[in-house]
Protein backbone atom coordinates (compact mmCIF):
# COMPACT_ATOMS: atom_id res chain seq x y z
CA UNK A 1 0.00 0.00 0.00
CA UNK A 2 1.37 3.42 -0.93
CA UNK A 3 1.87 5.52 2.20
CA UNK A 4 2.27 8.66 0.13
CA UNK A 5 5.81 9.21 1.39
CA UNK A 6 8.33 10.06 -1.31
CA UNK A 7 11.21 7.56 -1.46
CA UNK A 8 14.55 9.05 -2.47
CA UNK A 9 17.74 7.29 -3.50
CA UNK A 10 21.02 7.16 -1.59
CA UNK A 11 22.50 9.64 -4.07
CA UNK A 12 19.61 12.05 -3.52
CA UNK A 13 20.01 11.76 0.26
CA UNK A 14 23.73 12.55 -0.02
CA UNK A 15 22.89 15.58 -2.14
CA UNK A 16 20.33 16.76 0.42
CA UNK A 17 22.78 16.72 3.35
CA UNK A 18 26.08 17.50 1.59
CA UNK A 19 26.17 21.18 2.61
CA UNK A 20 25.37 20.61 6.28
CA UNK A 21 28.16 21.24 8.79
CA UNK A 22 28.56 20.28 12.46
CA UNK A 23 27.89 23.90 13.51
CA UNK A 24 24.39 23.70 11.95
CA UNK A 25 21.67 22.89 14.51
CA UNK A 26 19.92 20.28 12.42
CA UNK A 27 23.13 18.37 11.73
CA UNK A 28 24.66 18.68 15.20
CA UNK A 29 21.52 17.19 16.72
CA UNK A 30 22.15 13.96 14.81
CA UNK A 31 25.94 14.15 15.04
CA UNK A 32 25.86 14.37 18.84
CA UNK A 33 23.51 11.41 19.22
CA UNK A 34 26.56 9.18 19.58
CA UNK A 35 28.44 8.44 22.81
CA UNK A 36 31.84 8.01 21.14
CA UNK A 37 31.60 11.33 19.31
CA UNK A 38 30.56 13.19 22.47
CA UNK A 39 33.25 11.53 24.56
CA UNK A 40 36.01 12.53 22.14
CA UNK A 41 34.57 16.05 21.86
CA UNK A 42 34.46 16.61 25.61
CA UNK A 43 37.87 15.04 26.19
CA UNK A 44 39.27 17.70 23.85
CA UNK A 45 37.18 20.73 24.85
CA UNK A 46 37.41 20.03 28.59
CA UNK A 47 41.04 18.99 28.20
CA UNK A 48 40.54 15.71 30.06
CA UNK A 49 41.72 12.61 28.17
CA UNK A 50 40.28 10.31 30.87
CA UNK A 51 36.75 11.74 30.68
CA UNK A 52 34.04 9.14 30.06
CA UNK A 53 30.57 9.70 28.58
CA UNK A 54 28.03 7.02 29.50
CA UNK A 55 24.88 8.42 27.85
CA UNK A 56 23.69 11.22 25.58
CA UNK A 57 20.24 12.80 25.30
CA UNK A 58 19.69 15.02 22.24
CA UNK A 59 16.84 17.44 21.60
CA UNK A 60 14.86 15.02 19.44
CA UNK A 61 15.52 11.94 21.58
CA UNK A 62 12.63 9.99 23.09
CA UNK A 63 14.61 10.15 26.35
CA UNK A 64 14.40 13.96 26.39
CA UNK A 65 12.29 14.93 29.40
CA UNK A 66 13.22 18.60 29.47
CA UNK A 67 10.75 19.90 26.89
CA UNK A 68 11.07 22.10 23.85
CA UNK A 69 11.15 25.28 25.92
CA UNK A 70 14.62 24.27 27.16
CA UNK A 71 17.01 23.97 24.25
CA UNK A 72 19.44 21.17 25.09
CA UNK A 73 21.37 20.28 21.95
CA UNK A 74 23.21 17.41 23.67
CA UNK A 75 23.03 16.54 27.36
CA UNK A 76 25.84 14.14 28.22
CA UNK A 77 25.99 12.00 31.34
CA UNK A 78 29.59 11.56 32.47
CA UNK A 79 31.20 8.61 34.21
CA UNK A 80 31.55 10.59 37.44
CA UNK A 81 27.81 11.34 37.53
CA UNK A 82 28.09 14.94 36.40
CA UNK A 83 26.01 16.22 33.50
CA UNK A 84 27.41 18.25 30.63
CA UNK A 85 25.09 20.24 28.39
CA UNK A 86 26.59 21.04 24.98
CA UNK A 87 24.95 23.89 23.08
CA UNK A 88 25.71 25.11 19.56
CA UNK A 89 25.02 28.69 18.47
CA UNK A 90 25.66 30.19 15.04
CA UNK A 91 23.99 33.59 15.40
CA UNK A 92 25.10 36.32 17.78
CA UNK A 93 21.56 37.56 18.40
CA UNK A 94 20.85 36.74 22.02
CA UNK A 95 22.14 37.10 25.58
CA UNK A 96 24.25 33.96 25.60
CA UNK A 97 25.28 34.12 29.25
CA UNK A 98 21.66 34.28 30.39
CA UNK A 99 20.74 31.46 28.02
CA UNK A 100 23.43 29.30 29.63
CA UNK A 101 22.21 30.25 33.11
CA UNK A 102 18.57 29.48 32.24
CA UNK A 103 19.28 26.07 30.71
CA UNK A 104 21.61 25.04 33.53
CA UNK A 105 18.99 26.04 36.12
CA UNK A 106 16.31 24.13 34.20
CA UNK A 107 18.43 20.97 34.27
CA UNK A 108 19.10 21.34 38.00
CA UNK A 109 15.41 21.87 38.82
CA UNK A 110 14.23 19.02 36.59
CA UNK A 111 16.70 16.54 38.08
CA UNK A 112 16.28 17.53 41.74
CA UNK A 113 14.10 15.56 44.14
CA UNK A 114 11.59 16.93 46.64
CA UNK A 115 13.21 17.34 50.05
CA UNK A 116 16.69 17.03 48.60
CA UNK A 117 19.37 19.15 50.25
CA UNK A 118 21.07 21.69 48.03
CA UNK A 119 24.41 19.98 48.59
CA UNK A 120 22.97 16.98 46.75
CA UNK A 121 22.20 18.90 43.56
CA UNK A 122 24.33 17.51 40.74
CA UNK A 123 27.18 19.51 39.27
CA UNK A 124 26.49 20.79 35.77
CA UNK A 125 29.00 21.62 33.05
CA UNK A 126 27.93 23.76 30.10
CA UNK A 127 29.99 23.75 26.91
CA UNK A 128 28.82 26.58 24.65
CA UNK A 129 30.06 26.29 21.06
CA UNK A 130 29.66 29.42 18.94
CA UNK A 131 30.61 30.59 15.47
CA UNK A 132 31.83 33.88 16.94
CA UNK A 133 34.18 35.01 19.71
CA UNK A 134 31.59 35.75 22.39
CA UNK A 135 33.93 37.74 24.66
CA UNK A 136 35.96 39.29 21.81
CA UNK A 137 39.26 38.67 23.61
CA UNK A 138 40.81 36.69 20.73
CA UNK A 139 40.75 33.34 22.52
CA UNK A 140 39.31 30.08 21.28
CA UNK A 141 38.49 28.84 24.80
CA UNK A 142 37.08 30.65 27.85
CA UNK A 143 36.30 29.33 31.34
CA UNK A 144 33.77 31.45 33.24
CA UNK A 145 33.90 31.04 37.02
CA UNK A 146 32.02 32.54 39.96
CA UNK A 147 34.35 34.61 42.13
CA UNK A 148 34.23 36.73 45.28
CA UNK A 149 34.68 40.30 44.12
CA UNK A 150 36.54 41.46 47.21
CA UNK A 151 39.10 38.66 47.34
CA UNK A 152 39.17 37.27 43.82
CA UNK A 153 38.70 33.76 45.23
CA UNK A 154 36.83 31.27 43.07
CA UNK A 155 33.54 29.95 44.45
CA UNK A 156 32.47 26.39 43.65
CA UNK A 157 28.71 26.50 43.15
CA UNK A 158 28.56 23.37 41.01
CA UNK A 159 28.19 25.21 37.69
CA UNK A 160 31.10 25.08 35.26
CA UNK A 161 30.87 27.14 32.07
CA UNK A 162 33.15 26.70 29.09
CA UNK A 163 32.78 28.85 25.97
CA UNK A 164 34.55 27.77 22.80
CA UNK A 165 34.37 29.22 19.30
CA UNK A 166 35.23 28.52 15.67
CA UNK A 167 36.32 32.09 14.90
CA UNK A 168 39.71 32.24 16.64
CA UNK A 169 42.57 30.21 15.15
CA UNK A 170 45.49 29.81 17.59
CA UNK A 171 47.15 26.58 16.44
CA UNK A 172 46.01 24.51 19.44
CA UNK A 173 44.30 21.13 19.29
CA UNK A 174 41.08 22.76 20.49
CA UNK A 175 41.27 25.30 17.66
CA UNK A 176 41.95 22.57 15.09
CA UNK A 177 38.99 20.59 16.43
CA UNK A 178 36.71 23.62 16.23
CA UNK A 179 37.71 24.23 12.61
CA UNK A 180 36.12 20.86 11.83
CA UNK A 181 32.76 22.31 12.89
CA UNK A 182 32.83 24.55 9.81
CA UNK A 183 33.60 21.76 7.35
CA UNK A 184 31.18 19.77 5.24
CA UNK A 185 33.49 16.74 5.40
CA UNK A 186 35.85 15.76 8.22
CA UNK A 187 38.83 13.47 7.70
CA UNK A 188 41.32 14.03 10.51
CA UNK A 189 43.28 11.18 12.09
CA UNK A 190 43.60 13.19 15.31
CA UNK A 191 39.82 13.03 15.73
CA UNK A 192 38.83 9.45 14.78
CA UNK A 193 35.38 9.45 16.40
CA UNK A 194 34.49 12.76 14.71
CA UNK A 195 35.73 11.46 11.34
CA UNK A 196 33.85 8.16 11.66
CA UNK A 197 30.60 9.80 12.72
CA UNK A 198 30.72 12.38 9.91
CA UNK A 199 31.35 9.69 7.31
CA UNK A 200 28.44 7.61 8.61
CA UNK A 201 26.02 10.54 8.49
CA UNK A 202 27.15 11.80 5.10
CA UNK A 203 27.67 8.58 3.15
CA UNK A 204 25.97 5.60 4.84
CA UNK A 205 22.27 5.01 4.30
CA UNK A 206 21.36 4.55 7.95
CA UNK A 207 23.12 7.78 8.90
CA UNK A 208 21.65 9.68 5.96
CA UNK A 209 18.17 8.51 6.95
CA UNK A 210 18.71 9.86 10.47
CA UNK A 211 19.81 13.26 9.16
CA UNK A 212 16.95 13.48 6.65
CA UNK A 213 14.42 12.59 9.35
CA UNK A 214 15.59 15.41 11.62
CA UNK A 215 15.69 17.81 8.65
CA UNK A 216 12.05 17.00 7.93
CA UNK A 217 11.13 17.72 11.56
CA UNK A 218 12.90 21.08 11.41
CA UNK A 219 11.18 21.92 8.12
CA UNK A 220 7.76 21.00 9.54
CA UNK A 221 8.44 23.07 12.66
CA UNK A 222 9.44 26.05 10.49
CA UNK A 223 6.19 25.74 8.52
CA UNK A 224 4.13 25.60 11.72
CA UNK A 225 5.95 28.56 13.26
CA UNK A 226 5.54 30.55 10.04
CA UNK A 227 1.81 29.82 9.95
CA UNK A 228 1.44 30.84 13.59
CA UNK A 229 3.24 34.15 12.96
CA UNK A 230 1.16 34.76 9.82
CA UNK A 231 -2.07 34.27 11.79
CA UNK A 232 -0.76 36.58 14.52
CA UNK A 233 -0.01 39.27 11.92
CA UNK A 234 -3.47 38.93 10.36
CA UNK A 235 -5.15 39.28 13.77
CA UNK A 236 -3.11 42.34 14.71
CA UNK A 237 -3.63 44.05 11.35
CA UNK A 238 -7.36 43.35 11.54
CA UNK A 239 -7.45 44.99 14.98
CA UNK A 240 -6.05 48.21 13.50
CA UNK A 241 -2.34 47.79 14.19
CA UNK A 242 0.02 49.18 11.56
CA UNK A 243 2.55 46.87 9.83
CA UNK A 244 5.41 48.59 11.69
CA UNK A 245 3.69 47.95 15.02
CA UNK A 246 3.30 44.27 14.15
CA UNK A 247 7.00 44.00 13.26
CA UNK A 248 7.89 45.42 16.68
CA UNK A 249 6.18 42.42 18.31
CA UNK A 250 8.70 40.06 16.72
CA UNK A 251 6.89 39.06 13.53
CA UNK A 252 9.39 39.08 10.60
CA UNK A 253 8.90 41.81 7.99
CA UNK A 254 8.33 39.33 5.13
CA UNK A 255 5.48 37.66 7.02
CA UNK A 256 3.91 41.03 7.85
CA UNK A 257 4.12 41.96 4.15
CA UNK A 258 2.36 38.72 3.17
CA UNK A 259 -0.33 39.29 5.77
CA UNK A 260 -0.83 42.87 4.53
CA UNK A 261 -1.30 41.63 0.97
CA UNK A 262 -3.76 39.00 2.16
CA UNK A 263 -5.74 41.67 4.03
CA UNK A 264 -6.10 44.01 1.03
CA UNK A 265 -9.00 42.16 -0.68
CA UNK A 266 -10.94 42.25 2.60
CA UNK A 267 -10.21 45.93 3.13
CA UNK A 268 -11.31 46.80 -0.43
CA UNK A 269 -14.72 45.17 -0.06
Give each language-model segment a name.
Residues 2-22, 26, 77, 84-89, ...:
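Short, charged alpha-helical interaction segments and adjacent helix-coil junctions
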Residues 163:
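Catalytic-site signature of metal-activated, phosphate-bearing donor transferases
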Residues 1-160, 170-172:
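Accessory alpha/beta interaction modules
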